[in-house]
Design a protein with these regions (language model features):
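Extended, well-ordered alpha-helical scaffold segments
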Residues: 1-15, 71-89, 134-158, 205-219, ...
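Well-ordered alpha-helical scaffold segments within catalytic/enzyme domains
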Residues: 1-3, 46, 56-73, 120-137, ...
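Helix-terminus loop motifs that line ligand-binding clefts
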Residues: 2-68, 72-95, 273-305
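Aromatic- and histidine-enriched alpha-helix N-cap/loop-to-helix transition segments
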Residues: 3, 48-56, 77-80, 112-124, ...
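Extended ligand-binding clefts on enzyme/binding-domain cores
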Residues: 14-39, 114-119, 141-252
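Short linear capping/connector segments at secondary-structure termini
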Residues: 27-29, 101-109, 170-174, 234-236, ...
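CBM-like carbohydrate-recognition segments
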Residues: 31-32, 242-253, 271-333
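Internal metal/ion-chelating core segments
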Residues: 85, 89-156
Length: 333
């Protein structure tokens, strides 16, 4: 599917802001779409963006190049897409913390420097450095890798909460003048864990990753469950069916757990989650955003492309590890 991938990169290039970032949403012709993100936070005028959306495109291009070795695409998109994006990310760094400045989070709700967005920015700058090296731009490669190293180093001390044995959702400076006085959000958020391990911000064998997964199990898993259906974060109120529940399960977050199992060689545990998702999938193959935790009825958007994509992503990784799974996944899906 290389032509589709290149068409996506071309679309991103069309809508790229002159400062090197992507806006929250776009219309089909590449014009900025509607957004509910405010331009003013406190007394500051800010770009109403989610930095992870910019970062993930650079990371994806790195994955594309690693898989295809497409020099022609790299030479075309490096000056017009990769370099502007990487330059923006490398410049959009808090000089005190060495972490990215706050932007809106991936759930489109909070203005924070989140663990998730930090992880994606880190991985994107690593990828950008390798792409720069591939086109002979040594100065770019060294600079972006150095910024990535600073981010990873700072994350070890600023983004893990030992009191909760979990990653902070994020933090924000208390005011524009409070350079070192920061306010943490310690909500247990699945995206914080996913970002930390999937994008290499923390080592897979680190105590932070291991203890954080134990915390997820303690907070979200009932004693009689084989699969831990995951909400976005604790006490998520979006479309919550029961005020006493911790939140509705989301397919994407539950599948992130399966991806963690695959990364830690627990294929059978991952397979149980894939089976759990398939058992709730419509006969048409459609997945929703969320489900009712008691009746398993679909809630909110269906189909949700993100849910579909995470299922395919997880199933492909599972098939790669266990080829015999292919026949059952393709037959049942």
């Amino acid at each position: 599917y290389t032509s589709e991938t290149l068409a996506f990169f071309d679309f991103c290039r069309t809508g790229l802001h002159e400062d090197g970032y992507l806006m929250h949403k776009y219309q089909p012709d590449g014009a900025p779409g509607s957004s509910w993100h405010p331009y003013i936070v406190g007394n500051r005028c800010i770009a109403p963006i989610q930095e992870d959306e910019t970062a993930i495109v650079v990371f994806l291009f790195g994955q594309y190049y690693d898989m295809t070795g497409d020099k022609q695409a790299l030479e075309e998109f490096y000056p017009s897409l990769i370099k502007p994006m990487a330059t923006f990310m490398a410049d959009y760094i808090d000089e005190v913390t060495k972490l990215p400045h706050a932007t809106y989070d991936l759930w489109e709700e909070k203005f924070l420097t989140t663990t998730y967005s930090t992880a994606v920015v880190y991985a994107a700058l690593v990828a950008a450095g390798k792409l720069a090296e591939a086109v002979g731009e040594a100065d770019d490669a060294v600079h972006w890798q150095a910024i990535a190293d600073d981010i990873r180093r700072a994350s070890q001390t600023l983004l893990y909460n030992p009191d909760k044995a979990f990653f902070y959702k994020g933090y924000v400076h208390k005011s524009a003048d409070a350079k070192t006085d920061i306010m943490y959000d310690d909500t247990i958020d699945m995206s914080s864990f996913y970002g930390a391990f999937m994008f290499g911000l923390f080592d897979m064998e680190s105590d932070e990753i291991k203890e954080s997964f134990k915390t997820l199990q303690r907070v979200f898993m009932a004693s009689d469950q084989e699969v831990m259906p995951m909400p976005r974060y604790e006490h998520d109120q979006y479309n919550r069916v029961d005020e006493e529940s911790i939140g509705n399960p989301w397919f994407i977050c539950t599948l992130w757990q399966a991806q963690y199992f695959l990364e830690t060689d627990r294929q059978q545990a991952a397979r149980k989650i894939v089976d759990w998702v398939q058992s709730r999938m419509l006969k048409s193959g459609v997945l929703s955003e969320q489900i009712n935790p008691y009746t398993h009825e679909f809630i909110s958007v269906a189909p949700l492309a993100w849910s579909q994509a995470e299922f395919i992503n997880t199933a492909i990784d599972l098939v790669t590890d266990e080829p015999e799974v292919l026949s059952t996944v393709s037959k049942d899906a």
